Amino acid sequence: MVSIEGRFTEASSLKIGIVAARFNDLITSKLLSGCIDCLTRHGIDTSESSSQLDIAWVPGSFELPLVSQTMAKSGRYQVLITLGAVIRGDTPHFEVVINESSKGIASVSRETGVPIIFGVLTTDTMQQALERAGVKNNLGWNYALQAIEMGSLMKALK
C-alpha cells in the first residue's frame, strides 16, 4: 500500500493564487495577512516582485468563482485560496451569496483539477468574523496551510 500526503517542506516550489473579496475588507485583509504570514514562514516568496504568489481582488464573495476559474484555467497555479467574509443580515441575501459562491468554487476546482481552498467565513455577526480573523486565531493561516498541503499533494499525484 502506498500512502501519499502533501508535504509542508515542499512549499517553496508552489505557485499560489489568492482571490480576495473587498466586501468586509476589515476581515478579508486580516485573513490575507494570516495567509501571507504562513506562506512566508513556509518558504514562499511573498514580496511585491514575487513570481510565486499572485493576489486578485474582487468586489465580493459572489465574484470569487469567476476569477478563481480564470486563474485555475490559466495553468499558472498549483493551488488557489479564496478569501471572503459573508455576515448574516436581515435579508436572505446571505444565503444566496454563500450558496452560490461555495457551489461555484467547488465546481471550478472539480472542473479544472486545481485545488481551491474555501476561505470564506460565514458568520452571524461581525464579532464572530473578527474572532476568526484575529491575532489569536487567524483562519487565514489555516487556509494557507491547507493550500500548501493540497498543492504538494496534487504534485505528488501527477
UniProtKB/Swiss-Prot annotation:
Catalytic residues as annotated in Swiss-Prot or TrEMBL: H93
Enzyme class, spelled out: transferase
Keyword Ribosomal protein tagged: no
Keyword set, alphabetical order: Riboflavin biosynthesis, Transferase
One Gene Ontology biological process: riboflavin biosynthetic process
Single GO molecular function: 6,7-dimethyl-8-ribityllumazine synthase activity
EC number: 2.5.1.78
Family affiliation: Belongs to the DMRL synthase family.
Its job: Catalyzes the formation of 6,7-dimethyl-8-ribityllumazine by condensation of 5-amino-6-(D-ribitylamino)uracil with 3,4-dihydroxy-2-butanone 4-phosphate. This is the penultimate step in the biosynthesis of riboflavin.
Record's protein name: 6,7-dimethyl-8-ribityllumazine synthase
Organism from which the protein derives: Prochlorococcus marinus (strain SARG / CCMP1375 / SS120)
